[in-house]
Amino acid sequence: MLPSKRVPFLFTIILFLAGLGQHTTESVLPDCVLYPRCLITKDPCCM
């Protein structure tokens, strides 16, 4: 099992990579690629 402190970090990386993939395929707004910022601001365009 991974240490509990590393799980959110890995989860953020996965979301970030998913955001980059979505950006290249759908050309969404640049702010939507910044997933860590999106999670903090709860930006609707990232849902």
Swiss-Prot record:
It comes from the Eukaryota. Residues 1-21 form the signal peptide. Its main location: secreted. The keyword Signal applies. Keywords: Behavior, Secreted, Signal. It is found in: Secreted. GO terms for cellular component: extracellular region; extracellular space. One of its GO terms (molecular function) is hormone activity. The keyword Signal applies. One of its GO terms (biological process) is sexual reproduction. Main cells of accessory gland and seminal fluid. Responsible for physiological and behavioral changes in mated female flies. This is Accessory gland peptide Acp33A. It comes from Drosophila melanogaster (Fruit fly).
